[in-house]
Amino acid sequence: LSLHDALPIYNGWNLIDSVELCIQLKALGVDLIDVSSGGAIHNAKIDAKPGFQVPFATAIRTEANIPTAAVGLITEPEQAEHIITTGEADAVFLARAMLRNPRWALMASEKLGHRIDWALPLDRGRTA
């Protein structure tokens, strides 16, 4: 869900609209909202920096009382873990980080000290 269109001068789609929509979506059985924002219109004003869309996921999670997934320049394992453990969102969706590094999940597990138990036939592929 694009939470807002980043065009405040046009009085476009905003957080209040998104909260109302998410309440209705939850009533219809939607389980989780993937929260994004703006960027679809060429003159949108977006201050893109690491985690810049996480507060939007937190707002929807709190105001609409529905699980959310955070997105938006989430690139480091510690950053992703912080978002989950602090309750800012229920999930973290990674796109560009995993396109750049298809082994991102393995790198994150090693960096955060989490052990992944591999099936024996696949274990050699883990480090090959």
Feature map (PLM): residue ranges:
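Flavin-dependent oxidoreductase catalytic cores
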Residues: 3-128
